């Protein structure tokens, strides 16, 4: 009997304890709810909308670039801010309210905002731009913006008038773009003036006992510029040390063989020992200038440059690079380099600007001073941020015009924003190789891209969704 009474007493205690626990839990939930409502009420979004708590940072590595550190927010319902919808998942942003000067826009990759009344612009990354899915039908207030800093070989159809003129705003390597990225691989004028890696000419002359006068470092072989064909021919007239996968005849130390090490101090020290470096781009386009040009200038090595036809507009000084386009044949170029190699005074004329720390090109200085973004600079926006804000600001400019009863300003890209001629074969060799990537791949690809551009434009102008089958049927239509 005593045992039964004890069990009843224990059960009663457990019930009382459970009741107290539930009451305390309920009170905590109520208090938390009050706190969340207070936080919601005091958020800084205008028109009473909620600013959600930030999640941990999201890293998105850009091709060939330093990873961008990007924040994202959970979700935001808004009818007060223009929505900038990234149609390419470049940033990974699920939702972020961005400040662009006095303007604010909501940036997202969430395609559920496609039909939202405040969606004003669609942002595309050129390499990812394809026909599989486009935001159609396109409404009158829908702006399209293109970000494309890379080689045309990544997406040739963008470089034809029918496609490039689909976009209202651009950020490309061209100086004519709405946001020029021509100097995207140059940190600033100070790195050009720096003597940190400069090897004295006397030392370079001594090093010539074991090093060639020229160095070539490429691992992207047989690109549209056909640079390997030129260098292969040049090698028959002058010695070239070739690292990398293309025409390799010399090995880097094991720790420097990874492409990621091409900005390593050890790699710089090796390359800086040479007198000349073959700086050949993978494509020939106006203002398409990569690290292949800027790196030797930073190291105190004379670049032997082939690529942008407009490169003379971007030289630090009038005599700071040897331009391949000024020589009719690789043999002539080899003879000139050999002459400089044996004449210190002639050679020093190409590095005099470096020794004096004088960058005289006003176009280059102005471009560096006025650009709205930085390279590897934590104190400046990166060029993705600058692109987003350019579009945001232009959208707001039109909103303000319409609020005044004025028509919006219509922006439109043109072919100068991505100017690349058809890939061409070098005419120096009378005997063509049995197989050439240029003849067999890049020239046919360029020709087909013309048809793709025309087909895409016709389908987009029709302003309704289309299938891949419809697209390719138009491309290959007789």
Curated annotation (Swiss-Prot):
Residues 32-478 are lumenal. GO terms for molecular function: alpha-(1->3)-fucosyltransferase activity; fucosyltransferase activity; peptide-O-fucosyltransferase activity. InterPro entries: Alpha-1_3-FUT_met, Glyco_tran_10_C, Glyco_tran_10_N, Glyco_trans_10, GT10-like_C_sf. Keywords: Disulfide bond, Endoplasmic reticulum, Glycoprotein, Glycosyltransferase, Membrane, Signal-anchor, Transferase, Transmembrane, Transmembrane helix. Glycans are attached at residues 110, 168. Its main location: endoplasmic reticulum. It is found in: Endoplasmic reticulum membrane. The keyword Nucleotide-binding does not apply. Residues 1-8 are cytoplasmic. Pathway: Protein modification; protein glycosylation. Its EC number is 2.4.1.221, 2.4.1.-. Protein O-fucosyltransferase that specifically catalyzes O-fucosylation of serine or threonine residues in EMI domains of target proteins, such as MMRN1, MMRN2 and EMID1. Attaches fucose through an O-glycosidic linkage. O-fucosylation of EMI domain-containing proteins may be required for facilitating protein folding and secretion. May also show alpha-(1,3)-fucosyltransferase activity toward the innermost N-acetyl glucosamine (GlcNAc) residue in biantennary N-glycan acceptors. However, this was tested with a library of synthetic substrates and this activity is unsure in vivo. Belongs to the glycosyltransferase 10 family. This is GDP-fucose protein O-fucosyltransferase 3. It comes from Canis lupus familiaris. The gene is FUT10.
